[in-house]
Amino acid sequence: MRDIRITGGEPLVRQQVPHLIEMLAGIEKLEDLSLTTNGMLLAEQAQALHDAGLQRLNISLDTLNKEVFEKITRRDGLEKTLQGIDAAIKCGFKSVKLNTLAIKGVTESEVAELVRYALGRNVMLRFIEFMPLDTDRAWQQEQVFTGDQLLQILQNEFESVVPLSRPEPSQPAEEFQVAQGRVGIIRSVTAPFCEACNRIRITADGAVRNCLFATSETPLRGLIRAGASDEDLLSAIRGCLAGKAKAHGIDQDGFQPPDRPMYAIGG
C-alpha cells in the first residue's frame, strides 16, 4: 500500500481531521495522501490540512447553478463550496481537482461553463459517469450522461481537444488537453477500468471492500477489538482481495448494486 485517500460521506465533519492527516502522513513509505470533500467546510480547514501533510484534494462540484446545487445536495452550499475551492488553491496543495458527476438532464447545459471555471483557476476538472450508488436507489442506465456525449460537447465548445496518455494504467480518468488546461472523463459505466484497478476500501465502521460495487465485505473492527494480531488482519485482508470479481458488471443482466450507498462505502 503506497497511497491513502480519505473519503466519505464528508470527511471534514469529523473532529480533528488535521490530526488524523498528520498521523497518516507519518506512515513510513507512504507516497501519497489525499482527501475527497464536498468543499463546504474546506475554507476554514484547508490551511490546517495542508500543514498537517495532506498532498492532494478532490472537490465535488456538480453545478455552478445555485438552484440546481440545492436540488442535488439538498442544501444551500454553493457559495461555501466555491470559497473552499479558492482557499484550497491558495494553500498550494500538490494537486487540486474538481469532480463533476455527469447526469443526463443536468450536466449538458453546464459542461462548457464548468470547464471554463476550472481552466480559469488552473485546476483539472473530471467528469464522472453516474453510477448506481445513489442514496435513493433511483439510478437508471438512461440517466448516464456518457463519456462519448461529454467528449462531443467539449469538441463542439472548444477549438482544440487533444487526448493525452495516461501516466499510470490504474488512473481512472482519460485526460484531454483543452485550451491551456486538462479535462478528465471517467467512464466508470460505459468503459470500466476494472482490469487495472488497484484499490481497496475500508469503511467508516471498519470493513474492507475489494470493489466499490462489491455485495460483501470483510469486517476488521471485530477482529481488532478481539485482539487479532497483525498477521490475522493481513490474512483477512488477503482473503477479501482473493474474492475480488473480474469486473463490476453494471452492464450485465441481473446486476445488483451494493447494499450501501456511496457515502457509506467511501468513494
Where are these regions (language model features)?
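Radical SAM/AdoMet-radical enzyme domain recognition
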Residues: 1-6, 10, 14-126
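Auxiliary Fe-S-binding modules of radical SAM enzymes
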Residues: 116-120, 130-267
